[in-house]
């Protein structure tokens, strides 16, 4: 299915090139009209090309309009202000385009060469996921879905933290203070407990730190017993993580943890030294940057031979470069890691690895009492957050529809609760800090998941009533857009793929949320002003098909945010 703005762009581009030959014109730009009174789309061609053409922009716009080859797509053009061209789509084009909704959109104009690696979530083994993991996990999942929708070949990678000094401490804690019953019941929770226990005991007996280093060395050397324990910790942790990923509807193609790259880091450092990118500095291997880069030096190997996160991340890029036909890498982490990514991105550029790299950073989540801190022991676990959302959503569902079966209430509560948490995050600018307010998140009014889910369920309720009348909705129905409110809804449906495209280009899922909220408002205005069921048969069919296609767009948009739909609420 052609994207309306692209189709209009092609029509205008061909027209102005014929109208103004032998001119190096700036490309035509078509945007959705900001005010419905000024058409469906707008073009500023005359404004941006007046100097090139050598004439007044208003006069240029009039010339474009007066010589325009009208066809089935455009009904009329109007010139406004200093030279804007307002575009009004034909009713026939709108109707035919809406009936095509459900077909794949044509994004062939994008440069989709090579794979896109999206690196997100990345929890640390033997630690339960907490609220701080939410943003990377669900924003990364949404960006993965958006890129797949746009036709890119995506690899979603969970770069888990499965290596480091904590494993020596865990092994000491496991052997000295493990509660086997608790471990069997919830391994990762018990591992967290013994890790804290180790820290407490090590304050009293510092020799435990030496013991932990010795146990870690055994893991690093591949000693059988400790290696077996290390792998067990990973397996048990992933079991718990995958339960949460299933609940959040998050999916990964690969789980290459930090340990996977251990054997590659020596070669990375050697290459950096051989290319004189890294130099010896008091026994350590360090990369110094140009003053204009405004970056601190980056240590890639300490004087004791140990490697750092930067070394591991450079090795990761090298592996991906050599393994995949990779064109782009996208990383999702919080804002605190910005300097780290600037450093290692610059190093990979210095190595001549021509790959697009993006660090998508985000703010933190807050509640009324401020930032959640693990040091204070009050960090909210992700499972606890989702359980609380479920419980609160259940109370709302039970109050609004007490006649539902218990199974229906529980299912709706899970969808509404988890979706409310996800949408409260995804509907915000990712670089802003998020303040969770339960009443606001679970409200059926405003820009919330319950409002969008209810809008979709309402569509399905009306379509069920249409079906009970034995009225079929097929592609032969002409969708009428004579009514201003009908046309507003209909033309807005055609803007959906552009909102997805912009969300992908800017890594902002909130642009899709903004679109869906505006679409839902237009739909509810349509409900209130354009009756469906008690109308003549042609009007009924037209309006029923229009809301059916609206439901399809709403569903597709929610899926891009990782939010499932409900047919009943």
From Swiss-Prot:
PANTHER family: ARGININE--TRNA LIGASE, CYTOPLASMIC (PTHR11956:SF5), ARGINYL-TRNA SYNTHETASE (PTHR11956). Its EC number is 6.1.1.19. Transmembrane segments: none annotated. It comes from Fusobacterium nucleatum subsp. nucleatum (strain ATCC 25586 / DSM 15643 / BCRC 10681 / CIP 101130 / JCM 8532 / KCTC 2640 / LMG 13131 / VPI 4355). GO terms for biological process: arginyl-tRNA aminoacylation. It holds the Pfam family tRNA-synt_1d. The lineage of its organism: Bacteria, Fusobacteriati, Fusobacteriota, Fusobacteriia, Fusobacteriales. Signal peptide: none annotated. GO terms for molecular function: arginine-tRNA ligase activity; ATP binding. It is found in: Cytoplasm. This is Arginine--tRNA ligase.
């Amino acid at each position: 299915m052609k994207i309306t703005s692209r189709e209009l762009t092609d029509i205008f581009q061909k027209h102005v090139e014929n109208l103004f030959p032998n001119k190096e014109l700036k490309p035509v730009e078509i945007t959705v009209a900001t005010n419905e009174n000024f058409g469906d789309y707008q073009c500023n061609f005359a404004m941006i090309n007046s100097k090139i053409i050598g004439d007044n922009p208003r006069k240029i716009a009039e010339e474009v309009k007066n010589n325009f080859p009208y066809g089935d797509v455009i009904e009329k053009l109007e010139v406004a202000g200093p030279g804007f061209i307002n575009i009004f789509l034909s009713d026939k084009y709108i109707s035919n385009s809406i009936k095509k909704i459900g077909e794949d959109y044509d994004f062939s104009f994008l440069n989709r060469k090579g794979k896109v690696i999206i690196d997100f979530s990345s929890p640390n083994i033997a630690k339960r996921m907490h609220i701080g993991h939410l943003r990377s996990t669900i924003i990364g999942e949404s960006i993965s879905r958006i890129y797949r929708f746009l036709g890119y070949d995506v690899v979603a990678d969970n770069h888990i933290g499965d290596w480091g000094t904590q494993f020596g401490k865990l092994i000491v804690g496991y052997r000295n203070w493990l509660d086997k019953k608790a471990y069997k019941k919830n391994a990762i929770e018990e591992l967290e407990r013994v890790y804290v226990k180790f820290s407490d005991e090590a304050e009293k007996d510092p020799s435990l730190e030496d013991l932990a280093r010795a146990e870690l060395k055994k893991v690093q050397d591949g000693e059988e017993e400790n290696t077996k324990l290390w792998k067990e910790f990973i397996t048990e942790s992933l079991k718990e993580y995958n339960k949460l990923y299933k609940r959040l509807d998050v999916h990964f193609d690969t789980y290459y943890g930090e340990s996977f790259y251990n054997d590659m880091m020596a070669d990375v450092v050697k290459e950096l030294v051989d290319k004189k990118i890294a130099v010896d500095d008091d026994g350590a291997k360090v990369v110094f940057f140009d003053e204009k880069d405004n970056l601190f030096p980056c240590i890639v190997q300490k004087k004791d031979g140990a490697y750092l996160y930067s070394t591991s991340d450079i090795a990761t890029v090298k592996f991906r470069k050599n393994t995949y036909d990779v064109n782009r890498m996208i990383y999702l982490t919080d804002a605190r890691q910005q300097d780290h990514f600037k450093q290692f991105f610059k190093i990979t550029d210095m190595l001549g690895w021509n790959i697009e790299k993006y660090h998508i950073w985000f703010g933190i989540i807050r509640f009324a009492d401020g930032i959640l801190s693990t040091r204070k022991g009050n960090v909210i676990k992700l499972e606890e957050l989702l359980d609380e959302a479920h419980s609160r959503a259940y109370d709302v569902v039970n109050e609004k529809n007490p006649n539902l079966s218990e199974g229906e209430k529980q299912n709706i509560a899970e969808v509404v609760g988890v979706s409310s948490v996800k949408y409260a995050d995804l509907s915000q600018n990712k670089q802003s800090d998020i303040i969770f307010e339960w009443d606001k998140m679970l409200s059926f009014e405003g820009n919330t998941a319950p409002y969008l889910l209810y809008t979709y369920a309402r569509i399905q309720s009306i379509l069920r009533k249409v079906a009970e009348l034995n009225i079929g909705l097929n592609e032969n129905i002409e969708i009428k857009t004579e009514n201003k409110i009908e046309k507003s809804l209909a033309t807005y449906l055609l803007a959906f793929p552009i909102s997805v495209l912009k969300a992908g280009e800017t890594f902002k899922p909130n642009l899709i949320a903004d679109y869906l909220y505006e679409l839902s408002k237009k739909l509810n205005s349509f409900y209130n002003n354009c009756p469906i069921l008690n109308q003549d048969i042609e009007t009924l069919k037209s309006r029923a098909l229009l809301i059916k296609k609206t439901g399809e767009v709403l569903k597709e948009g929610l899926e891009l945010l990782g939010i499932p739909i409900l047919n009943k609420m």
